[in-house]
Amino acid sequence: MAPKIFIDGEHGTTGLQIRTRMADRRDVELLSIPEAERRNAAMREDMLNSADIAILCLPDDASKEAVKMVSANNNVRVIDTSTAFRVHPDWAYGFAEMDKDQGGKITSARFVANPGCYPTGAVALIRPLRAAGILPDGYPVTVNAVSGYTGGGKQMIAQMENADHPDAITAPHFLYGLPLTHKHVPEMTTHGLLDRAPIFSPSVGKFAQGMIVQVPLHLDNLAEGATMESIHAALVGHFAGQDVVQVVSLAESRALPRINAVELAGKDTMKLFVFGTPGTSQVNLVALLDNLGKGASGAAVQNMDLMLSA
């Protein structure tokens, strides 16, 4: 019998993407509530408790409510795509390539917190350097990023695509999170193994899908002897043996005139780059991904497949 999957919130941006990815699969059975019954709490609870895996695509508070509905039913495993449980010690963090054993933790977990899009890129760049001892305690990390507007969900999609929207956004590029309290900062801090919160400056561009995350570093404030080459080697070693995260060679990176934010749109992979000029004291680390792919729905399906492989 095929395992039953229920996407709670299947009509939102992330839920729709997950459902589209699974539309042609015959190895799972998708449970669904008719859109007209979305607010039928009894039907929703029944669906949650009938699933082998429930994928929650809900706001934080609604996700917490859904988890309570299945907490006593050990037959139901959960993937949550909100920020509610991403730093919770009892939840596996759903970035399978983060460490060599992370995929195994996801496979055996009952509860998996799907990573945020920005933290996926930031953690991929920062954690290997912390693990290798290159990025010292107390380093003032800065993370700059630009995302496709689909990361803002249905509301922002309407604002960006409908000029008649009462709160239409016409800017081709804009900063937000200006008070430096973005909800992804705790996630970056925890899973980046940082002892102080990074400064995070997010922005949105007038393109639907895609993302660039940047972490600039001063070499003379890193561990003694740190170079562009040693940083690149740390990334290569950390992500060796898998095919989702690609560390682009220094030679290939040097030949690039620009980075295209939408290059990986529609894909579930991620590319990492190390930029700089040999002999100087600065480097810029860059992650390239699809905010709805490896940054959201693609990761959720990957985590589901790992859990089903147990």
Swiss-Prot record:
InterPro entries: AGPR_AS, AGPR_type-2, NAD(P)-bd_dom_sf, NAGSA_dehydrogenase, Semialdehyde_DH_NAD-bd. Keywords: Amino-acid biosynthesis, Arginine biosynthesis, Cytoplasm, NADP, Oxidoreductase. It catalyses: N-acetyl-L-glutamate 5-semialdehyde + phosphate + NADP(+) = N-acetyl-L-glutamyl 5-phosphate + NADPH + H(+). Its EC number is 1.2.1.38. The keyword Amino-acid biosynthesis applies. One of its GO terms (cellular component) is cytoplasm. It is found in: Cytoplasm. Its main location: cytoplasm. Coiled coil: none annotated. PROSITE patterns: ARGC (PS01224). SUPFAM superfamilies: Glyceraldehyde-3-phosphate dehydrogenase-like, C-terminal domain, NAD(P)-binding Rossmann-fold domains. GO terms for molecular function: N-acetyl-gamma-glutamyl-phosphate reductase activity; NAD binding. The active site is at residue 117. CDD domains: AGPR_2_C, AGPR_2_N. Pathway: Amino-acid biosynthesis; L-arginine biosynthesis; N(2)-acetyl-L-ornithine from L-glutamate: step 3/4. One of its GO terms (biological process) is L-arginine biosynthetic process. Catalyzes the NADPH-dependent reduction of N-acetyl-5-glutamyl phosphate to yield N-acetyl-L-glutamate 5-semialdehyde. This is N-acetyl-gamma-glutamyl-phosphate reductase. It comes from Rhizobium rhizogenes (strain K84 / ATCC BAA-868). The gene is argC.
